[in-house]
Amino acid sequence: MTAEATEKRPGIAAAVVVDNGRVLLVRRRVKEGSLSWQLPAGGVEDGETVEQAAVRETKEETGLTVSAVKVLGGRLHPITGRHMSYVVCAAESGTAHLADADELAEVEWSDRNEVAERVPDGFWEPVQAYLDSALSARG
């Protein structure tokens, strides 16, 4: 893929949602590389901020209403080559469920041990550091 083609593809915004000592994970029907369990995420639409995209994608995929708290950062994904932004979000209302059965196979709140099993290589370092802190705060 050319650099020009990569630049024209929309970036991806991922929501990092921790509530009651658990992180919201989704299992995609189609794996991206070795990943099947991941954070709720999707493309940033024209005119949308990464925060808005993370909030929208979480609602579309899981039915959960969240609010953006802060952007942890961004990187070029080593497998997909797409720009990823990671946004900490707070759960506001609703119950997480499988709202997008075409794209997802499962939605789950995972504790730190389950995260280690489902994502054995961990997340990008700033995301993993945030999760380690947020999940250890509850034990």
Write out the residue ranges for each language-model feature.
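Conserved N-terminal beta-strand and adjoining loop/helix that marks the start
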Residues: 2-23, 43, 74
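Short beta-strand micro-motifs in enzyme catalytic cores
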Residues: 11, 35, 83-87
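Conserved Nudix-box catalytic region and its N-terminal flanking loop in Nudix hydrolases
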Residues: 19-60
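A short coil-to-beta-strand element that immediately follows conserved catalytic motifs
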Residues: 64-73
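Active-site-adjacent beta-strand/loop module that shapes the phosphate/pyrophosphate-binding cleft
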Residues: 75-97, 108, 129-134
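NUDIX/MutT-family hydrolases
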Residues: 98-131
